[in-house]
Amino acid sequence: MPRPIEALIHAEALTHNLARARAAVPDARVWAVVKAHAYGHGIARVFEALRAADGFALLDLAEAQQLRDLGWRGPILLLEGVFEPRDLELCSRLNLWHTVHCEAQIDWLAMHKTHQPHRVFLKMNSGMNRLGFRPAAFRAAWTRLHALPQVDEISLMSHFSDADGGRGIAAAMQVFDDATRDLPGERSLCNSAATLRHGADAAVRADWVRAGIMLYGSAPDFPSHDIAHWDLQPTMTLRARLIGTQDLQAGDTVGYGSRFTAEAPMRIGVVACGYADGYPRHAPSGTPVLVDGVRTRLVGRVSMDMVTVDLGGLPQAARGSEVTLWGRASSGAVLPIDEVAHAAGTVGYEPMCALAARVPVRLDAAG
């Protein structure tokens, strides 16, 4: 038999989370962000569940081609734009909208020969200091683009650095508003955190929001708020089985480095999942896990192919018992990926995207 581990992608949860994005910004359009292999879920698996979105946003031309091959004829936005001049040919052929964040991309457009003008999203660096034109240079970039026959419509966009935290978005909004006040074009500002926390403000939600991590059942501002607060549902479950048990005496240690020591007699279970499956290697003892739908904890260091869990209070647990590393147990109990990631010192995005190729993935169309 195959190794007892699998990941499930819950289609109904994806559809529910997209509906939550729409509810937060009822008069704006929603990009479903499917970059990074749809946050580890797989574009082909999430497409049908998310096709009610107004458009799909991603980074990779191959992923854009995949969406067209799946039958999507609506807008596709390249969030980082093109990486070399010849990419513009594929943008023309696939009818892709693309971000412009630097002078080189404008130069390439000026040299591009096309009969189909491009729809571009001009990006401002409003304080994130990754991609985008600084406010003082933004208007000149817009003027250059506006003069090009290769460019049709110019939308204006930025990305908040602190929409999920206490610093908030007021300063970035002021920078953006000051630099774009009399420029025409649609606006796109909100990521998931801004959509949920600030979407009630018409100026913030603007014309397009970019819903990413919220679609996949992770709270963008965890631990300030969890998925229950935002009415989001887990879309990925990582599930394995117990493949063995051990009875420990007080003083016995567990795993590499003897990081866990039993303080009293206890029983532990060995789970067919490790960091080679995408489980966070730095998850410490105490990280939550579900065994037969009951919450318990990790004990000892995460190994390549195994983790060990506390079976105290679980007398029925035995070889073959279901272990939910994150997501939804067969019993209906839920362990949000955010809790696991937080215990491991990271965020929910990372274990989603780190799901290993060796883990079989199954689409749960009914869940």
UniProtKB/Swiss-Prot annotation:
Q: What would you give as a GO molecular function for this chain, any one? A: alanine racemase activity
User: Could you confirm whether the keyword Cell wall biogenesis/degradation appears in this record?
Assistant: no
Give GO BP annotations, semicolon-separated.
D-alanine biosynthetic process
Q: Which UniProt keywords apply?
A: Isomerase, Pyridoxal phosphate
EC numbers listed for it are: 5.1.1.1
Which InterPro entries does the record associate with it? Ala_racemase, Ala_racemase/Decarboxylase_C, Ala_racemase_C, Ala_racemase_N, PLP-binding_barrel
Question: Can you cite an annotated GO cellular component?
Answer: cytosol
UniProt: substrate binding residues:
130, 304
Cofactor(s) of this protein: pyridoxal 5'-phosphate
Q: Which pathway does it take part in?
A: Amino-acid biosynthesis; D-alanine biosynthesis; D-alanine from L-alanine: step 1/1
Matching entries from Pfam families are given as: Ala_racemase_C, Ala_racemase_N
Which residues catalyse the reaction?
A: 35 (proton acceptor), 256 (proton acceptor)
Q: Would I find Glycosyltransferase among this entry's keywords? A: no
User: Which reaction is the catalytic activity of this chain?
Assistant: L-alanine = D-alanine
According to the UniProt record, list the residues that bear N6-(pyridoxal phosphate)lysine: 35
Against SUPFAM superfamilies, the record matches this protein to:
Alanine racemase C-terminal domain-like, PLP-binding barrel
Query: Tell me, what does this protein do in biology?
Result: Catalyzes the interconversion of L-alanine and D-alanine. May also act on other amino acids.
Q: Which family does it belong to?
A: Belongs to the alanine racemase family.
- Protein name, UniProt field: Alanine racemase
